[in-house]
Design a protein with these regions (language model features):
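Helix-to-loop junctions at the C-terminal end of transmembrane segments
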Residues: 55-66, 257-271, 355
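C-terminal transmembrane helical hairpin of 12-TM major facilitator-type secondary transporters
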Residues: 271-316
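Residue-level signature of mid-helix packing/kink "hotspots" within the transmembrane helices
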Residues: 20, 48-56, 106, 140-141, ...
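Short amphipathic helix-loop junctions that connect adjacent transmembrane helices
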Residues: 24-38, 226-242
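Cytoplasmic helix-loop-helix junction between adjacent transmembrane helices
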Residues: 97-138
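Juxtamembrane intracellular "pre-TM" segments in multi-pass secondary transporters
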Residues: 178-212
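Helix-breaking motifs and short loop linkers at transmembrane-helix boundaries and internal kinks
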Residues: 34, 66, 87-92, 292-294
């Protein structure tokens, strides 16, 4: 089981490394085509829109035919998408490249489902999902640093490298990842309508609060992430290399938090519910510090936001996976990805429009949404305490 876990985590790491290489460079690459900041955010949204449509279907497909074939297909599509993006000579081709990747964006969801499959209990499940976050953090630690260096060759070169890494990952996954879904339901009917699984999930009273908090978190965090490179360029004069270093620093703190602190500190001393509430407040505070545009406070906010957002991802996902029926875990986690993708559709458009009015406004939006989420979580904790009694 330990070997399976390491193999899945390595697959995630290679995938995120490719993404980490290009994410700080992407706004500068797109603007070299003469695109506006709003067009940059629309590119993020195009990926997310198609991920919103495909994620529940791919998750359900992995419940039906297994995790491994869906994972291989998804990573192969990522490679094709990055190659199209790198070879683009027009804004239209840039959109096509992101759409291809978005339409098959099931790799992260399926990897999560595979780790949930081999988890032994609630604590192990949250810790395993935290390790995925740690892999994500390492990818974002190394990727932007590599991307910053590669961008000195040309703005398109990092995207060729990302496509090459995804191609290697297809081979790695095909040869080393074995099937973890022992409860495949080949008789289940699949629907390509993305609203069908969302409607089913919305009927589940236990899951609804988690879905709402997930959307609020998604819109808040993605609004800031989308305009991050543009904001630090305006506020502090940072270019692509310095922006890559900031993303790398965030990756260091995310990896340390998810790989060590989550299991050995946070989950050891706090319940998942309390940890979710606390990290929501920390995320809100970090956005306030960023909005002040004071460099030392901004660096502090990088540490706080890396810890808070990574804990929230792991804890909310773990709680939802624990409530999902065994034969529907892939679909439910796919719905989580779909909701995050919906946030990625909404957030970049709104953030881009707000940024063009005043650069600090996307942070204000995030503060308001996370404040609302904290209020909802506080009420949930209070109801749980009242139900438990003295």
């Amino acid at each position: 089981m330990q070997k399976e876990k390491i193999t899945i985590l390595l697959t995630v790491l290679v995938d995120v490394l490719g993404f980490g290489i290009v994410i700080p460079i992407l706004p500068f690459y797109v603007t070299s085509f003469g695109a506006s900041a709003f067009t940059v955010t629309l590119l993020f949204s195009s990926f997310a829109l198609f991920a919103f449509v495909s994620s529940p279907f791919l998750g359900a497909l992995s419940d039906k035919i297994g995790r491994r074939p869906v994972l291989v297909f998804s990573i192969a599509s990522t490679a094709i998408g990055w190659f199209v993006f790198a070879a683009a000579d027009s804004i239209v081709l840039l959109f096509i490249g992101r759409i291809i990747d978005g339409a098959a964006a099931g790799n992260f969801t399926v990897a999560q489902s595979a780790l949930v499959d081999i988890s032994t209990d609630e604590k192990d499940r949250a810790a395993n999902l935290g390790l995925i976050g740690a892999s994500f953090g390492i990818g974002f630690m190394l990727g932007p640093l590599i991307g910053g260096v590669l961008s000195t060759v040309s703005h398109s070169f990092p995207f060729w490298v990302a496509g090459g890494l995804a191609s290697v990952n297809v081979l790695l996954t095909s040869l080393n990842v074995r099937e973890t879904n022992t409860r495949r339901d080949r008789s289940m009917l699949l629907s390509i309508n993305p609203l069908a699984p969302l409607a089913r999930a919305a009927m589940n009273a236990e899951l609804r609060p988690f879905f709402l908090n997930w959307i609020l978190f998604g819109i808040s965090f993605m609004s800031v992430q989308t305009i991050f490179a543009l904001f630090v360029q305006e506020a502090f004069g940072f270019g692509s290399f310095a922006t890559g270093l900031l993303f790398s620093a965030m990756g260091v703190f995310t990896a340390f938090n998810q790989g060590f602190l989550l299991k050995h500190v946070w989950l050891k001393h706090f319940s998942e519910a309390v940890l979710e509430y606390a990290m929501t407040i920390v995320l809100c505070i970090s956005l306030i510090l960023m909005a002040l545009s004071i460099l030392p406070l901004f660096f502090l906010a990088i540490i706080l936001i890396a810890s808070a957002q990574s804990n929230l991802r792991a804890v909310i996902t773990s709680r939802v996976a624990g409530l999902a029926p065994p034969h529907m875990k892939g679909e439910i986690l796919g719905i989580m990805s779909s909701l995050m993708a919906a946030s990625m559709v909404i957030a970049p458009v709104v953030a881009g429009a707000l940024f063009e009015i005043k650069s600090v406004l996307p942070f204000v939006l995030g503060i308001v949404l996370m404040g609302l989420s904290a209020i909802l979580e506080h009420r949930s904790l209070r109801r749980a305490a009242e139900k438990k009694g003295p």
